[in-house]
Design a protein with these regions (language model features):
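Conserved non-catalytic scaffold segment of RNase H-like nuclease domains
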Residues: 5, 10-148, 162-184
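A short, structured active-site edge motif that brings together acidic residues
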Residues: 147-157
Length: 193
């Protein structure tokens, strides 16, 4: 029986069972990658301070809820990191430390995001990256499991556009005549997706 959740010395989540044993959490309950498309879904994107959810932080989350092809709600917020972001992240995203000063912290943001997305199918570009950050932060901050199924648009693009020079979101958007101006801001990336 599950008793508590903790973080080990390497920053990885674990659970403690009733007999005192520690079990590593390997994103148990994480949703599946699917192909079927329901009428209601949420497109999401995050911006982070780096690539590894064990050491890097979320600095922006945007999610757009659709029903029958119409946007019926948007969740978008900057997230205050525990340390200032570096110049490279600012140059990539356009997000500055000044912009993050008054942003909510990750714990508050995770609960609001969880409430917004509910049980919707999640859609995004390279969304497995986003899901891993969100899964770990929901578990660490709120002891919640993100079990939503998801569709990764990048995986689809790789299958249907094998001849592209790469499968970055901007390259695929350009292929379809979509201007990726403002890319690497979460809300814009959601709209491109």
């Amino acid at each position: 029986m599950f008793i508590s959740i903790g973080i080990d010395e390497d920053g990885r989540p674990y659970i403690t069972t009733s007999d005192g044993a520690r079990e590593k959490v390997v994103r148990k309950g994480k949703g599946n990658s699917v192909i079927d498309f329901p009428s209601t879904y949420t497109v999401l994107d995050i911006e982070t301070t780096g690539l590894d959810p064990r050491y890097c932080e979320i600095i922006e989350i945007s999610a757009m809820k659709y029903s029958s092809g119409q946007n019926i709600g948007t969740f978008s917020t900057l997230v205050k990191p525990s340390e200032p972001i570096d110049e490279y992240i600012t140059s990539l995203t356009g997000i500055t430390n000044d912009m993050l000063k008054s942003a909510p912290d990750i714990s508050e943001t995770m609960q609001k995001f969880y409430n917004f997305v509910g049980s919707d199918l999640i859609v995004g570009y390279n969304v497995n990256f986003d899901i891993n950050f969100l899964y770990d932060n929901l578990l660490n901050c709120r002891s919640l499991i993100l079990s939503n199924s998801f569709i990764d648009v990048m995986r689809i693009a790789r299958k249907i556009l094998p001849g592209l020079k790469n499968h970055k979101q901007a390259t695929v958007a350009d292929h379809y005549g979509i201007s990726p101006a403002g890319a690497h801001r979460a809300a814009v990336d959601c709209e491109i997706c």
